[in-house]
Amino acid sequence: MVKLRQEDIKTKEVLSWKGIHLFHFTFSACSMKTRIFMGLKNIDYTGHHINLQKKENFSPYFQGITPRSLVPVLVDDGEVHIESNDILKYLDNKFPAKSLIPAHKEEEINQMMIEENDLHLDIRNVTFKFLVPKFLNNVKIQEKSKSKATLHGNEDSEDDANRKFWENYKKIGITDEVATKSLLNLKLHLDEINEKLTHHTYILGNELC
């Protein structure tokens, strides 16, 4: 589970928040799956919308919560959790009724989560190539914090890849070659899912959980 230490968090106000809070963006794939998951489990939460199109994720306020500048972020009674798949696992453990990650399917679901996580860059490439309004491509992207992101007191290597994406996006955007490669990779995985759905109502069987 990726739970941030208090010393990793610069926006200290969230440490005193009570209840469950979710920082999210309407059209973020990772935000959408988290909202769907919470909806299926009937989890009440306070939402905080971060507009990625306006680069609000690069604001000092949000980078003070998660230097990775990514949504979603879950705050539970002042504890900050990042990475959507880890958030799903955390919530399923915290609210065990109507488990969506049942023990008898946990290994298979974990493997699917790893595969899905590996597709994040492809999803981002396609999103920024085809869905981000063209006029925003001409807007100067607010600079990411100069300070290195830390995770559990150590430099966050995951943030290096995130920075590299934004640096390349500022310079050349998403090229046709990159977008095509990402689309083909996504199609490959979606075809595999469609094949499973020809035999079952859901990916892992005829029951949701």
Where do the PLM segments sit?
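GST-like domain detector, emphasizing the conserved glutathione-binding G-site
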Residues: 1-157, 163
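GST-like fold's C-terminal all-alpha helical module
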Residues: 121-209
